[in-house]
Curated annotation (Swiss-Prot):
Signal peptide: 1-21
Residues with glycosylation annotation: N65, N203, N294, N465, N548, N559
Domain WAP: 121-170
Compartments reported by the entry: Cell surface
Pfam family, one: WAP
The keyword Lipid biosynthesis is assigned to this record: no
Protein name per UniProt: Anosmin-1
Entry GO CC: cell surface; extracellular region
Domain Fibronectin type-III: 180-281, 286-392, 418-515, 545-652
Chain's gene name: ANOS1
Keyword line: Cell adhesion, Disulfide bond, Glycoprotein, Protease inhibitor, Repeat, Serine protease inhibitor, Signal
Gene Ontology terms for molecular function: serine-type endopeptidase inhibitor activity
InterPro entries: Anosmin-1, Anosmin-1_Cys_box, Elafin-like_sf, FN3_dom, FN3_sf, Ig-like_fold, WAP_dom
Superkingdom: Eukaryota
Amino acid sequence: MVRRAPGASLALLLWVTAVSCSPAGPGAATARRQDEAFSTARLTSRCLSLQITRISAFFKHFQDNGSLAWCQNYKQCSKCLEPCKESWDLKRNHCQSFCEPLFPKKNYECLTSCEFLKYILSVKQGDCPAPEKASGFAAACFESCEADSECSGVKKCCSNGCGHTCQVPKNLYKGVPLKPRKELKFIELQSGDLEVKWSSKFNISIEPVIYVVQRRWNQGIHPSEDDATNWQTVAQTTDERVQLSDIRASRWYQFRVAAVNVHGTRGFTAPSKHFRSSKDPSAPPAPSNIRIANISANNDGTVNVMITWDLPEEPDIPVHHYKVFWSWTYSKYVIPAKKKRRKITDGPQNYVVLEGLQPNSNYNVELQAVTRWGQIRLKSAKVSLHFSTTQDNRNNNEQTSVEKPPKGVVDPYPTFQRRKPTRFLKIGTPFYQDNQLQVKIYWKKSGINMNQFQVHSLLESCTHNDTKGLEKVTELTYENYMILKDLSFSCKYKVTVLPAKSKSRFKAESIFFVTPPCSTFKEKTHKHINCAAEEVPVLPKVLAKPENLSASFIVQEGNITGHFSWKISKAVLHQPMTGFQVTWAEVTTESRQNSLPNSIISQSQILPADHYVLTVPNLRPSMLYRLEVQVLTTGGEGPATIKLFRTPDLPPFLPHRPHLKHHPHRYKPPPEKY
């Protein structure tokens, strides 16, 4: 779990979710997870880059973790981030199927972002070399690959003029940020959290840089890379530090960091030195959900009872063994300890069979977990279970803890016979209605007996001074949703939903959200909304617009390079100009069923204010391209100037040599990413 770093006003870390679920071996699965972490970071960088002028209006430096928080709560930017939030097999499903249920009306940002993510998941960094440059095995005339994923390492599936082979790309790291410095600094805070810090080398990237942080660990007296877990992504952040709260004593941790932007990455730093917490490990948690799994009768009239429980998820030290005590009881008065019987089970085992119990009798069972830390034994609190071997009462078993009051009726079925409930707590897009800011929160019901819910909303903080004293509101509902009303602008809220019946075994679920600034609604709805409480002023409108868009093309060695230029009139510049945002896309001729325009994913680049020319290599021949240029100023972006250009045909190529393997379609190298 990641907590807010001290001193950061708006800290947010984006957790990575899996985007593909194709089966593979352990090594391939690890490589796939790494590629997906990089891909989602590239997508995040792209989304922040597209909103860079709006971000700069709120933050002095867009390379700030607050920009991620802003992006998640700004409507257009949050739509752009949506594909990397959800677990979705983008390789097998259409982006339209993903985005339209989330945004039925305006889903352009989600769709283009989804298409971009699909593209970078399938196409590796770098450009294919010219076909005539292939040599050795790479020049063999047969189809040895169809996609980049079939090639090892950084190699790409490229044409050699008579086939496709895996080749080392050119321009592998063009526009890609440098690796962070390999020295990582660890600070163990009094709270037990661990702060990991790093520093970056000179950054050649104008786009926002996302840092992907991974860790692995081993358990034992000494650090060991051979016994360590696989690398796992713990966070993505634009800051040069991360604060982790789930650090366990007795574990040896290693970390590594990669710098990623929209163009790609140079990979991770070397593994850090090992870190182990200085605090002593905690005793194991008390066993949970102890219950009867089975009762069976023996030929001699005695009864065997199987007791089962849930294993702890992640104790500081793995459980070495469990102690099980049981005795006959009368009216829940326990027999003296010297008459108790005892068994010991191994730590990985979550059941025990009590043999030879008397029928029609009451029994009490106590269970305790034990771990070993050197020569010290750490013991959990005991939990107890009262049950009867009477046939009619076998489902009426009560579980209690020695240190806690009874918890009610125990589920008589083992874990593998029950389906654990899952609920999804989600926040809709805030809206302004009836002169007040509102938001809809909804969830999935998990049981037929869960008819009424308590909804607690807590105002935690605001960017302006009007915090209203951290107010808390509690409401009841019979529905699986609730609309929270009379919210404040630019404020952070915590919402907790739980069943109204206190005896339910389902735990409460919480979610945080930040309301947008007042100016967002005032600009869109033109309603009379009082925004005096907000400190962020409404930016003046930018009128500057690029003029005389023109294009020239150079054909060399089978590649088409486009040079796009424009002019700007200084007379209409009322704010200092910071640069240009240039977006281009390949336009198709087929019609589409969704709301996307007839183009593939758009690609963008931010240019400095003194650059009036953009060079784009690897354009496709005889293809229509859409060019869009906007002026960026300190007051925001100006209107876009749009023009269509068609690339020239390629000259006749070398005679086609025979294939050893035929495919109905040819692989076409995609345009270079910017």
